Amino acid sequence: MPRQHAIEDYRNFGIMAHIDAGKTTTTERILYYTGKSHKIGEVHEGAATMDWMTQEQERGITITSAATTAFWDGKRLNIIDTPGHVDFTIEVERSLRVLDGAVCVLDSNQGVEPQTETVWRQGDKYKVPRIVFCNKMDKTGADFYKCLADIVDRLGARPVALQLPIGSESNFKGMVDLVRMKALVWNNEALGAMYDIVDIPADLADKAKEYREKLVEAAVELDDDAMAAYLDGAEPDEATLKKLIRKAVLTGAFYPVLCGTAFKNKGVQPLLDAVVAYLPSPLDVPAIKGVDDKGNEVVRHADDKEPMSLLAFKIMDDPFVGTITFCRIYSGILQSGTGVVNSTREKKERIGRMLLMHANNREDIKEAYAGDIVALAGLKEARTGDTLCDPAHQVILEKMEFPDPVIEIAIEPKSKADQEKLGIALAKLAAEDPSFRVSTDQESGQTILKGMGELHLDIKVDILKRTYKVDANIGAPQVAFRERVTKRVEHSYTHKKQTGGTGQFAAVTLIVEPSEPGKGYEFESKIVGGAVPKEYIPGVEKGIESVLSSGVVAGFPVVDVKVQLIDGKFHDVDSSALAFEIATRACFREALQKGKSVLLEPIMKVEVVTPEDYTGSVIGDLNSRRGQIQGQDMRGNANVINAMVPLMNMFGYVNNLRSMSQGRATFTMQFDHYAEAPANVSAEVQKKFA
């Protein structure tokens, strides 16, 4: 079956936002107006088409990015729904990898919120072209112009309005379209499906003229001919202006800003028009790079004629189909029944069922093309971030980097049957979400779950109980401490056991020193003249690595350390890789003690938004949690407090804050860095763990 839509007519985009800015509602309306969804699902009632996990429906937050296909104005839209809660930033990063453009949704009442900054920065990191939609214009306190100022102040970006609101709060009727210089006015009867194009209201004429000028001036900067014509008094026509706005979006020169209210069905169609007009097709963004099986860089263009390559970006467990792997096809054509290679894991797979996903129903397809986002059922080996490709033209597309978890809990199944269910469930959850890790505590034998925050783990536990019916006891959350040496030391150690039979002999001298934070572990052999034969060096490395997982302060992983092997001795008969491993292990442990190892604790960046009346209590409380206040700011009529607080002092903070502010204050936190723990904290932790 030939390709039905030319690749330049594809728009692979996501909707990114702060929690509660109305992202899911906006996606819902897009599906409604593109004719895919017959009944509008309201998040308030927990029935949105995109939010299809029970946990999401209850919490009213989007957790898993479901990919959906819809059509508008002859263009094919692949919409990737991204979560907006900070504990799920990994999902946002992952979906930003596979989309070409994004709509950033702001709550017009709140402006730019903490999580907006986070997802915006991730968008910057992956150079995602964006347009901005100021949602909730019907809310009390909605302020479109403050949103524009916020984008400059808080995101450091350049916004250019393409629309101005007509009326505000409950009188919000529509918007002035600055490209066409017309007013779009909605009548409330037709669920937003109908709007009238009329002349700009007289009271907005001056403002419209002022902002139209700003738009045209920003646009003509991108083209010398247009600039010359403009200076001669000729304004660009509509087609030229749109072309220039598109160029601005693709280059990041400025960000077009639109407004509306998705909940009240106003402004969604012009937003769709803007997606089609300004966001990139797969041909407008740089081709993806990867490495071939010889390690050379290769480029894969969005072209059906190129060898097939696709990236798995999301894995889900579906009760009807089994494991579903969401993939973006970067090049070539994929047919069901073909054999592919998972080049990341060097495993072969066969493509079984191929599905095109609508938020919660699916359509079987036989063939998919470059630019498509498809769901593959029944892949055995694929994990998030893996590349699947043509066996004759192997490539590994860019690797995704996943952050280390900062919080952990122990989980104990209540019965033997639960134990079995838990094993299966955890394997699936870990495959679906690389920022969620599972390990076993060597000493206690307990299963440890590790994640990015309390909410992250709460939801995983909830899924275990509901979806997989595992009955288990959950321990209190623990902080993921780390250890590091603070001074450079040189240390020698000799291991010998030479009493009858085969003996063991190895001597090593190590230099152990702290490296820059975030550098991790580095090893270097500086052996000259064969003091330690080459074949024993892996034994030395193994010895070091066995200590790294459990340091000398309280048994936590050792980070940011550089180890050099500078000297050693060996015996022709009694030396072995094992002897060198044992010697190095002892030498490294003693060096860590000599090098004054300290305990590091994760420090979280916390932002609290609170009504003025509670500011004093909030700051006092943060100080009592060893928080360092970084600054305060006003946002609307609320006070914004930024602080750095140790994670170990933030457990249960949500309930505390709620009771302190009568439920009116909110907070977000995310991992920022590791810092040395004070002596009293270190002593307490050592008593508990060492």
Swiss-Prot record:
Binding locations of GTP: 17-24, 81-85, 135-138
SUPFAM superfamilies: EF-G C-terminal domain-like, P-loop containing nucleoside triphosphate hydrolases, Ribosomal protein S5 domain 2-like, Translation proteins
GO CC entries: cytoplasm
NCBIfam families linked to this entry: EF-G (TIGR00484), PRK12740.1-3 (NF009379), PRK12740.1-5 (NF009381), small_GTP (TIGR00231)
Keyword Flavoprotein: no
Gene label: fusA
Chief location bin: cytoplasm
Gene3D superfamilies according to UniProt: 3.30.230.10, 3.30.70.240, Elongation Factor G (Translational Gtpase), domain 3, P-loop containing nucleotide triphosphate hydrolases, Translation factors
Family under the similarity heading: Belongs to the TRAFAC class translation factor GTPase superfamily. Classic translation factor GTPase family. EF-G/EF-2 subfamily.
Domain tr-type G: 8-283
SMART domains the record matches: EFG_C, EFG_IV
GO terms, molecular function: GTP binding; GTPase activity; guanosine tetraphosphate binding; translation elongation factor activity
Source organism of the structure: Nitrobacter winogradskyi (strain ATCC 25391 / DSM 10237 / CIP 104748 / NCIMB 11846 / Nb-255)
Purpose of the protein: Catalyzes the GTP-dependent ribosomal translocation step during translation elongation. During this step, the ribosome changes from the pre-translocational (PRE) to the post-translocational (POST) state as the newly formed A-site-bound peptidyl-tRNA and P-site-bound deacylated tRNA move to the P and E sites, respectively. Catalyzes the coordinated movement of the two tRNA molecules, the mRNA and conformational changes in the ribosome.
Subcellular localization: Cytoplasm
Organismal lineage: Bacteria, Pseudomonadati, Pseudomonadota, Alphaproteobacteria, Hyphomicrobiales
GO biological process, one term: ribosome disassembly
Protein name per UniProt: Elongation factor G
KW Endoplasmic reticulum (keyword) present: no
